[in-house]
Amino acid sequence: MRLSPDQTRVILQCVRQQFGADVGVMLFGSRLDDGARGGDVDLLVESPSPPSLLQRARATMALEAALNLPVAIVVTQRGTPGSAFARIARSQAQWLEVPA
């Protein structure tokens, strides 16, 4: 995974600040490939309730400013299958946890 512990902390803090403390955050896409270079930060957020478009925009802007990287956020409601894209992303994603 090509995220530093500090980047992981920032992601979790920003996402939870915008969507609530009870969301789950997963990383998917090219940042999971240690051999790759560059790329945006693709996040899959599982939320107990669907966030507003404004919440999504604020989270994206906060993350892009804090990380100085492009960020894409896909949000699914916990307990629902989500879109076909979200199901594919989830099948390849890794949960983000606060580094020790």
Identify what each model region corresponds to.
Residues M1-M26, L32-G38, S47-A100:
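Catalytic core of pol beta-like nucleotidyltransferases
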